[in-house]
Each structure stands twice: as C-alpha cells, then as structure tokens.
Design a protein with these regions (language model features):
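Jelly-roll (double-stranded beta-helix
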Residues: 1-28, 35-43, 54-59, 63-65, ...
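Structured binding elements
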Residues: 69
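Short, well-ordered beta-strand segments enriched in hydrophobic/aromatic residues
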Residues: 44-50
Length: 210
C-alpha cells in the first residue's frame, strides 16, 4: 500500500447529482441525489447499494454531524452504541454526533439505502478520498489505509470521523508521531487527483445537474 502519485493532475470536474461513487474493497456504491450547496441544511445524500458482504470501513463516530439511514429494499445490519439491529425496508436509523456505530450487509440480498449526512461537504471530501484510495489499491482488505496514510487522514478529518480502533486516547499521540514521517515519505491527507470536493466548480442551485 503505497500512496497516490503526487504529480497526477487534479480532477476538477464539477460534482453533480447522479454521480456514482464506488469502493471496490468495502463493496459500497452510492448515487449522489443531493449536494450540500443545493439545500439550506448543507446536507449530502445518496442512494447506497450494499451487496451481500458489503460493510463500512470500521466502527466509528462523527463528532459533529448527523447521519441518517433509510432502508428502501433489503436489510442492513447496524451496530449503534453497542446494540445490534437489522433494519428492513421502510425502517430508519438516525445517528447523532458522538455515537459509535458500524454497519454491514450480512444477508443474501442487496440492500438499497438512502443515506443523508448533515452537514455533508467535508464528509463528502473524506468519502471521495477513501474511495479513491481503495480504487487505486492503497488500502488493506478491510478498506483501511496504510497507518502512515491514516495518521494524516484521521488528523485532517478529526472533526468528521473518529475510528474506534486504535482507541482515541492512543490515536492522538500516535498519529502525532506518525504524521511528520508520513509527509516525509510522500503521503498527504488528501490528493487533488482523487478528491474533487475542495477544487471542483459548484453547480448553482438554479442550474440543472448533469
């Protein structure tokens, strides 16, 4: 697991409704249906397809955002604050800031789930980075980046996500030690060739996407 090419040209295509974002390692796929600059709440939303065996990269919590799952078809197993439940079609879960959670599809049918995140812009930047690293082969079989990459990513997005392992009390000093080494070895928190969310033009509200 090396790092992406730092000399690769940036991807500055506009981010639009209807895009498909895929992670070939965690088997997540989502179609964007709302973008933070298109609504007053700053919400990002997508329709996620989770095939059997799909799962998020690991148990985590969001310090300052709300995440909502609405199952449209199939079933999604959710671990919410240590309690496991299975959401079926028509059922929802709302995850408040600071609540540890995880999800996966342990059934034999593809799950279709609407996912909403508020506020969503920096969350989108994180997801585009993680998915891009996965597509280029820079993650392990669980979808987690190299520890040097993770040190920079977790520090940059500490307001968005905190992974449960290693424990947060260990992460802070550990990542503080690893971050300078990671930069010297060419790692960056994000990469313009993978993450358009900070550079791409915004499609105005009154301009049809696509």
């Amino acid at each position: 697991m090396s790092h992406p090419d730092l000399l690769a040209p940036p991807d500055t295509r506009p981010i639009e409704v209807g895009e498909v974002w895929e992670n070939p390692v965690t088997l997540e796929s989502a179609v964007t249906v709302d973008l933070p600059w298109l609504n007053d709440e700053g919400r990002a939303a997508g329709i996620m397809t989770a095939v059997p065996g799909a799962r998020v990269v690991g148990e985590h919590m969001h310090p300052a955002l709300v995440e909502r799952f609405s199952v449209e078809d199939g079933e999604l197993t959710v671990l919410l604050d240590g309690r496991k439940s299975v959401l079926g079609a028509g059922e929802r879960a709302e995850i408040q800031p600071g609540v540890w959670h995880d999800w996966w599809n342990e059934g034999d049918k593809t799950a279709i789930v609407r996912v909403e995140v508020t506020p969503g812009e920096r969350f989108g930047h994180l997801i585009e980075t993680l998915f891009g690293l996965a597509r280029e082969g820079h993650v392990n079989k669980r979808g987690m980046p190299h520890p040097l990459q993770l040190a920079l990513l977790a520090t940059e997005f500490s307001d968005i996500i905190v992974f449960r392992k290693p424990p947060p009390a260990v992460q802070r000093p550990l990542f503080g030690i690893l971050a300078p080494l990671a930069r010297r070895r060419g790692y960056r928190a994000t990469y313009p060739s993978l993450s358009r969310t900070t550079l791409a033009p915004r499609v105005p509200r009154d301009t049809p996407a696509g």
